[in-house]
C-alpha cells in the first residue's frame, strides 16, 4: 500500500519509522510519504493561510497550495483523497477494514480554522476521529493511518494478531496475562494454564462478551449473537 500525507508538519509523521509500521516500510509492504503543503504555495513569504472573508476568528488554509499539492501527488498516487475534518464520517474499525483494501490513499491534514471551501472539489472523502477538537489534522491522521496499515496483508505476522483485538469482530478484547503466574497474590486463570485450546477459546469469547456488555453495551446491539452467546450473557446477568 502507498500512502501520501499532505501536511504542514511532515516531521510529525516520523513516528511511522518505528515499531510494526516501520518494519513494514522496511520490507516495502508499505510506503508512507509526507508532502509539505507549504512547498506548493505561490506566496513569496511562503504563507499558506489568510484571514477569512466575512470576518471571524483564526485563519483559513488557502485553496491554491492545497490543490496544487494534490494535483502533483495525483500524478503518481491515484488513490482517494481523504480530508481529516469535523464534518466527516466518524472513523471506526469497519472503515479501517474498507480502506485497508485500497492500494493507494492520499490524506490531507487541515490546520488553523479549516480549509478554503473551494479545495473540497478535489477531496473524495472526509473523515473525523470523533466529536472533539484537535490542533490539526495531523493528530487525527496518525492513528487513522496506523489503524488502516496494520490490516494490510503482511504488516502483522498473522491475521490472528488483529482478528482477536478489540473492535475487529465487534467485541472488546478478552483479558490478557503473562508471566509470572501469580503476582501480588493474583493468579492467572487456571483455564489459560490448562493447555486445552477449545476451553481457552470459549473462556476468551465469554470474557469478551461480558466485558463488552459491561463497558460498551452499545456494541452488543450491533453484534449478531449466537445461541451460545445469549446463554453466556444470561448467566452473566444472573451474577450481577
From Swiss-Prot:
Q: Tell me the keywords, alphabetical order.
A: Cytoplasm, Methyltransferase, S-adenosyl-L-methionine, Transferase, tRNA processing
The record ties this protein, via CDD domains, to: TrmD-like
Q: Name one GO biological process term.
A: tRNA N1-guanine methylation
Sites binding S-adenosyl-L-methionine sit at: 110, 129-134
What class does this enzyme belong to in the EC scheme?
transferase
Q: Which SUPFAM superfamilies match?
A: alpha/beta knot
Return the EC number. Answer: 2.1.1.228
What's the catalysed reaction? guanosine(37) in tRNA + S-adenosyl-L-methionine = N(1)-methylguanosine(37) in tRNA + S-adenosyl-L-homocysteine + H(+)
Mention any Pfam family matching this sequence: tRNA_m1G_MT
* Cellular localisation: Cytoplasm
Name a GO CC annotation attached to this entry.
cytosol
Q: Which GO terms describe its molecular function?
A: tRNA (guanine(37)-N1)-methyltransferase activity
Keyword Transferase belongs to the record: yes
Superkingdom of source? Bacteria
Provide the family line. Belongs to the RNA methyltransferase TrmD family.
Q: What does this protein do?
A: Specifically methylates guanosine-37 in various tRNAs.
Q: How does it assemble?
A: Homodimer.
Put simply, this protein is called tRNA (guanine-N(1)-)-methyltransferase
Organism this protein belongs to: Clostridium botulinum (strain 657 / Type Ba4)
Question: Its gene?
Answer: trmD
Amino acid at each position: 500500500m502507498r500512502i501520501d500525507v499532505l501536511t504542514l508538519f511532515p516531521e510529525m509523521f516520523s513516528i511511522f519509522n518505528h515499531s510494526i509500521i516501520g518494519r513494514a516500510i522496511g520490507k516495502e509492504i508499505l510506503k508512507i510519504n509526507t508532502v509539505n503543503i507549504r512547498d506548493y504555495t505561490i506566496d513569496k513569504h511562503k504563507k499558506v493561510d489568510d484571514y477569512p472573508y466575512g470576518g471571524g476568528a483564526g485563519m483559513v488554509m488557502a485553496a491554491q497550495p492545497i490543490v496544487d499539492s494534490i494535483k502533483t501527488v495525483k500524478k503518481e498516487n491515484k488513490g482517494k483523497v481523504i480530508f481529516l475534518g469535523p464534518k466527516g464520517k466518524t472513523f471506526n474499525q469497519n472503515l479501517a477494514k474498507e480502506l485497508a483494501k485500497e492500494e493507494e490513499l492520499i490524506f490531507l491534514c487541515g490546520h488553523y480554522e479549516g480549509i478554503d471551501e473551494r479545495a473540497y472539489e478535489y477531496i473524495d472523502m472526509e473523515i473525523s476521529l470523533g466529536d472533539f477538537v484537535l490542533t490539526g489534522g495531523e493528530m487525527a491522521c496518525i492513528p487513522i493511518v496506523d489503524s488502516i496499515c496494520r490490516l494490510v496483508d503482511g504488516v502483522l505476522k498473522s491475521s490472528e494478531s488483529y482478528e482477536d483485538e478489540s473492535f475487529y469482530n465487534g467485541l472488546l478484547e478478552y483479558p490478557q496475562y503473562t508471566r509470572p503466574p501469580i503476582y501480588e497474590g493474583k493468579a492467572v486463570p487456571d483455564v489459560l494454564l490448562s493447555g486445552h485450546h477449545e476451553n481457552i477459546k470459549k473462556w476468551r469469547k465469554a470474557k469478551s462478551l461480558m466485558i463488552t456488555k459491561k463497558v460498551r453495551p452499545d456494541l452488543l446491539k450491533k453484534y449478531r449473537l449466537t445461541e451460545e452467546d445469549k446463554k453466556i450473557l444470561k448467566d452473566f446477568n444472573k451474577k450481577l
